[in-house]
Amino acid sequence: VNGQVNKIVRFILLGSLLLSAGAAQKQSTRGQPAANDAYKLVAVKVKGTSRYTDQEILAASGLQIGQPAGDGDFKEAVRRLGDSGMFSEVLYSYTASGTGVKIELQLADTADTKLVPARFENFVWFSDSELLKELQTRVPLFKQLLPLSGNLLDRVSEALQALLTEKHLPGRVDFLREEDESADTLSALVYRLEEVSIRIQGVEFPGASPDLTPLLTVAARRLIGAEYTRSALAAAVKFDLLPVYLRRGYLKAAFAPSDARVLPAATTGEQGPADIEVDAIVPVTPGKVYSTSSVNWKGISAITAIELAPLLHMPPGQPADEVRLHQDLENVTKLYRSRGYMTAQVKSEAQFDDEKSTVHYDLNVAEGDLYKMGELEITGLDTQAKARLEAAWTLHQGQPYDADYPKKFQEDTGSLLPRGIRWAVTVHESLDAKDKTVDVEIHFKQQ
């Protein structure tokens, strides 16, 4: 009409098609131009995504405003978006006229539950913000989250390798899948450098007070000379550094993710080009010191508060030592197990008063059922030695079980074993939740 030709083509890519670039594509043929028709791309409109801007989608698609674009280009753009794994659905339509072609993309974002965060282990020359900026320029769909399927993780890996090459930096980029052991699910995708040695020369603690810095330095001593990885530093924070604060009442102390400062290369010739030394930087926000105001037991009946009191070391008015509290509660659990309460659990619940800088603890005890001694089985010994040990076992069937007894039994009966032989002893306790009994197997093995 009036010398103008309007043509509309639709293309749909559903979630199942994302799994295979070669999957069949559904396409309508209404008014479809010839496959080699090309028009100047004059506009791109994006709908349906809350994760990306129009500019990011355009960059990821490979299309360019002002350049010729035809049916094959649009199919390739859809393939690029679909193969990334960041969309569960891609639909597009375009209108071609004498002035050019306008394309509309209708997208459905992949659910957040199907994405995991990306982490960077040892890219010591870059901060997280610098890496993110570089990657978003090179991989427009990357925003610190990666899909469980699709090729986006490979695109990120390639971009990181290209960045290293451009900067003349050593290392080969690899990635691994990190699992959450408690949930048996993928928790992160971790990018790291291989074929390069990055060693920790020193550790700094920005934010730490002068009186605690020496204690942190001692706690971090095993890191000196170790390979620099953020996961190793995170483990050191959890098990070595944070307890320095928790022992002294800094109950809200927090460590930020570690960074690194690359040190000047050695000039002695002893280092190769792929040997890097760094100072690890572990920022800390100590917070305030909390003193214990009071402690309250809840859920106890089998053991009295008077019996439990000697096991607890949280004096009112003194800085709350959560490391000691954890140890104390483990001892409380052991006491319950020695009385036959084999499934007893004790959990602390802290209630903070920030104005007074105090903390109250509720110690919640789930005692569980009383278990009694079941059957005893001794294996690995000759008949006579087995008979001697069975006679020495005084925890009889039907009596409340004592989880401390097997260890004491081993200590007291060593003289009953055949002489001249070193024995490895393993004790296995089997709980019968229905009958509330504990069967004990003691196995002896010659070393």
Q: What is the predicted role of each segment?
A:
Residues 25-447:
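Periplasmic polypeptide-binding modules associated with outer-membrane biogenesis and secretion
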Residues 6, 21-23, 28:
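A composition/secondary-structure signal for short, hydrophobic, low-basic-content segments
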Residues 1-12:
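Bacterial N-terminal signal peptides that target proteins for export
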Residues 10-20:
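Bacterial N-terminal signal peptides
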